[in-house]
Amino acid sequence: ARELPLVSLETYRPLHEFDVVGVSLQYELCYSNVLLNLDLGGVPLRSEARGDDDPIVLAGGPTCTHPEPLAPFVDAFLVGEAEEVLPDLLRTIGRMRREGRPRREVLAAMSQVPGVWIPSFYERGLDERTGMMVVTGRSAAGVEANAPERVTRIFVRDLDEFPFPSRFPLPYVEAVFDRASVEITRGCTEGCRFCQAGMIYRPVRERSPEKVVEAVLDGVDTAGFDSTSLTALSTADVSCIDPLIKTLVP
């Protein structure tokens, strides 16, 4: 009612003043919320309407394996697991923004990072066999930027190199799952054909038991929770689950 823009949690900075707006696409039903947040934050909805002073809208998460439904609204998708490439990617964006480089140059530099898909660098066409709109190749801008013809999903090879975060914002209200959570493995040994996560998070990788115990104790100590969930697609299939539980529950 007061036409106040959407602001950040920590600094109360309006969304449209950031260099990058990052969104995590966990489910397709979240797509409308992404557009609502951009609108409330004063960010032009369509990427083609954004100028050099507008933030880069960067999306990641599981549903980025099929990015096209949000392609008109997102400047760049990071397909796969972001831990290894995201810090350098953000530093590159920040440096180029400070130098006053045009938006197209920033996107061109981003397209050289493994796993980054820039929708505006590709063309679409109607597939006569399926009746669906599909990517047909690079656009003229994509060729000029030397964008890859195909973007490959990236993944972290060693989870222990990226400790699970234990310091995170606490909600003002009681959460549905009121406990700490630690990812102990990524990927799944079952390979069920109906399971998207089991396919896109291949190969199976496990954190070492020592790192898991360290993350559990750190999370409980910093967040004040008295219980922790060991998160995995199939926790019982983790190779070290028996000794891990015996260590955590004496």
Where are these regions (language model features)?
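Glycine-rich beta-alpha loop elements in corrinoid/cobalamin-binding modules
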Residues: 2-142
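Short amphipathic alpha-helical segments, especially helix-boundary/capping motifs
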Residues: 9-14, 62-66, 145, 168-169, ...
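Short, exposed beta-strand "edge-strand" segments with a Pro/Gly-rich flavor and a Y/T-containing core
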Residues: 10-12, 99-100, 149-155, 205-206
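Generic detector of short, locally flexible boundary/turn motifs and exposed helical patches
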Residues: 23-25, 42-46, 52, 143-151, ...
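Surface-exposed loop/turn and secondary-structure junction residues enriched for glycine/proline
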Residues: 32, 46-48, 67, 73, ...
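Intrinsically disordered, low-complexity boundary segments flanking structured domains
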Residues: 101-108, 148-149, 246-249
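Ferredoxin-type iron-sulfur electron-transfer modules and their immediate structural context
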Residues: 119-123, 127-131, 135-181
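Radical SAM [4Fe-4S] cluster-binding motif and immediate context
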Residues: 157-250
